[in-house]
């Protein structure tokens, strides 16, 4: 069950790793959260190409910001980045009940829901990550992709037995071949 989304808003200058991590930390402290925090996402985020000028990657920034106190952040990543087409197909299968899973998303997760509805698919099966320009700031950004990517990585990590089963083609999957419709993902 996806309960809530916490977004870094550009107008509040929260759309960067340190600011969003602080926002999450403050929210969790306000709610007296003591159960620990798992930090997951794209395993490529550990690579040198994603570090800041000091050589620190986003996962280190997040765990250091959340601190060593009651939040006890732990990085939980897949060993390597799953192929985008395969992971998107897996997520669609999970939505269809693959391996007995039932995925529900709270109505308050408006941006995630928007991404899942409007994210387009390229002809090769990958996500269309077209950039748009913000009318107010003039800054280019990826309109759809980040939140659906987060969901992909989360499901591939936490449902890893089902993910492995799906990749191997195990299970009682029925494959239906039809004409390709490239209007959007099936999420």
Task: Enumerate the language-model features and the residues they cover.
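Mg2+-dependent endonuclease catalytic cores in nucleic-acid-processing enzymes, primarily RNase H-like
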Residues: 1-136, 161, 175, 183-187
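Acidic, Mg2+-coordinating catalytic module of metal-dependent nucleases/exonucleases
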Residues: 137-167
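Charge-dense, low-complexity polyampholytic segments
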Residues: 163-178
């Amino acid at each position: 069950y996806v309960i809530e989304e916490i977004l870094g808003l550009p107008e509040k200058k929260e759309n960067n790793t340190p600011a969003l991590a602080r926002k999450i930390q403050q929210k969790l402290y306000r709610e007296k959260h003591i159960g620990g925090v798992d930090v997951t996402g794209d395993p490529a985020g550990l690579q040198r190409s994603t570090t800041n000028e000091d050589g620190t990657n986003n996962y280190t920034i997040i765990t250091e910001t959340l601190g060593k106190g009651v939040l006890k952040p732990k990085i939980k990543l897949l060993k390597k980045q799953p192929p985008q087409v395969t992971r998107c197909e897996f997520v669609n299968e999970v939505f269809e009940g693959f391996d007995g899973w039932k995925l529900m998303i709270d109505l308050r997760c408006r941006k995630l829901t928007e991404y899942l509805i409007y994210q387009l698919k390229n002809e090769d099966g990958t996500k269309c990550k077209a950039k748009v320009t913000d009318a107010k700031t003039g800054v280019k950004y990826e309109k759809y992709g980040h939140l659906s990517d987060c969901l992909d990585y989360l499901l591939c990590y936490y449902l890893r037995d089902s993910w492995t089963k799906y990749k191997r083609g195990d299970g009682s999957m029925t494959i239906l071949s039809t004409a390709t419709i490239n209007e959007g993902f099936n999420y």
